[in-house]
Amino acid sequence: MAQVHVQGWVAAGFEEVEEEFARNFTKRKQTGAACAVYIQGKKVVDLWGGVSDPYSGTLWQEHTMVPVFSSTKGFAALAGALAVSRGLLDYEEQVGSYWPEFAVNGKERITVRQLLSHQAGLSTVDTLQLEKFADLDTSQVANKLANARPEWTPGVKHGYHAWTIGWYIGELIRRVDPRGRSLGRFFHEEIASSLDAEFYIGLPASVPDARLAQVRGINSPAQILKHIHEIPFSMLLGFLNPRSLTARSMVDPKRLVANENFNRREMLEIEFPSGNGIGEVRAMASIYGEFAAGGKKLKLSKSVLRTLEAPPELPLSGAYDHVNRTKLAYSVGFWKPIEGHTFGSSHRAYGHPGAGGSFCYADPDFELGYAYGLNEIGGYMDNNPRENAVRQAVYRCLK
């Protein structure tokens, strides 16, 4: 067996998780990754391995921090849930009651629930004129979003708000927080700091570069050929049609969100709540673990936890996502399990995958928080075979 740098710890009974994680490096060509699991508030898996910098060969260390791309959306949604729990926000209220400028151009009756569940028809970014990294910060784009016009009748169907969902959550948080904090500050001060968890939406200047994993993504013809089979064919067709909702919601002509740009501090230090969250993977698992175990430290209300754990309320036309071009289930900012995209042990699970195969979620059935982060970004979202293998091993250990 090839030598591989895998370190960390697993509790008794979870040895198979460590074995499967090691196989990701010896058999499945994982570059660098970390995985952590918390159950009932206690850490049972804390593993890391490979290299944090695929260019220099620097080894992944215990406190390496890694970007998790769209998994960031789940943490933004957790901040939204905390705001609901504290009575600052109501999922059933119209967005315009918190953000009057939003209530124009057919958006007057959109509820917070519809917006956070990707049903509002506000996914497209092709008219936003995003030219530089700073333009991706919520503070810079919110006024443009207020004037947007829905692409479909809100509530009739859904489509992944790939870039915009985090901005909308961020602006709502700023408007309802009595202190007017940004989402990144609200999350850090009310959730991450309370749980002693290092995860940021907006990286502080105090974090040294040496702790940051370097991402290697799809940035050359050779890389495209290597990973093209990982991207669903229907989505590829969408990317190739510039008039499709897929292209208009996801294609980035200026390449601002190209994978390699997440190696640049000017990208990581802004607040782009749909995609630039970064932290220790154990921190991600511990945060979801707090929600999965009832949120006692954060004093979460039972009603908001019931909402997060409830089956998704699908739009009138059903589960087909008109941006991702597959059947998906969303609820108040999170992915929910659905056939073909399952995770957790029942419909009560909630979380979010990210580009290349990161995944962070809560499984209330086991009071479990799970996180997997990596730095080799291919075409997978939630069906990365490396992450899946480790996740399945976790559940075999729970039987």
Description of each model-found segment:
Residues 61-63, 148-155, 167-170, 264-273:
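Flexible glycine/proline-enriched surface loops and loop-helix/loop-strand junctions
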Residues 62, 67-71, 85-127, 146-147, ...:
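Active-site helix/loop module of the DD-peptidase/beta-lactamase fold
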Residues 5-68, 90-93:
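Short, conserved catalytic-motif segment at the N-terminal edge
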Residues 37, 41-42, 67-90, 115, ...:
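Alpha-helical scaffold elements that line and support the substrate/ligand-binding pocket
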Residues 293-296, 309-320, 380-399:
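Short, gly/Ser/Thr-rich active-site loops of penicillin-recognizing serine hydrolases
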Residues 217-281, 310-366, 399:
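Active-site Gly/Thr loop motif
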Residues 51-53, 376-379:
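A short acidic/small-residue loop/turn micro-motif
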Residues 118, 165-172, 271, 275-296, ...:
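Active-site-proximal alpha-helical segments within enzyme catalytic domains
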